[in-house]
Amino acid sequence: MEEKVNSMPRIGEKAPEFKAVTTQGEINFPADYKGSWVILFSHPADFTPVCTSEFMTFATMEKQFNEANCKLVGLSVDGLYSHIAWLRTIKEKIEYKGMKNVEVTFPLIEDITMEVAQKYGMMMP
């Protein structure tokens, strides 16, 4: 039996739809973001150094993205409680390149079933 492999959506293609639990409550993607640009970005794991610095940078730039009518949505296959603990650690304990006490206010999707990651071609079959 051949396994279906999803590829990353290309510019101009319809974004795969999903509902998901996030650190900011449930989202219905992409319907909740109608009329806005969205950057849906993923990271391999919470509490990793590069992912932490990337999240801190995105969070400090969120106002600029909002001014450009662009929303940020993060995704990983970690669970919600891991996400919450990681974001709390970023805010309370991490300092990087002059950034500290950084609060991440954009949603971070819990995807422990890998459903969303697979829809977006982010996982190997």
Regions found by a protein language model. Give the residues of each.
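Chalcogenol-based redox active-site neighborhoods
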Residues: 1-125
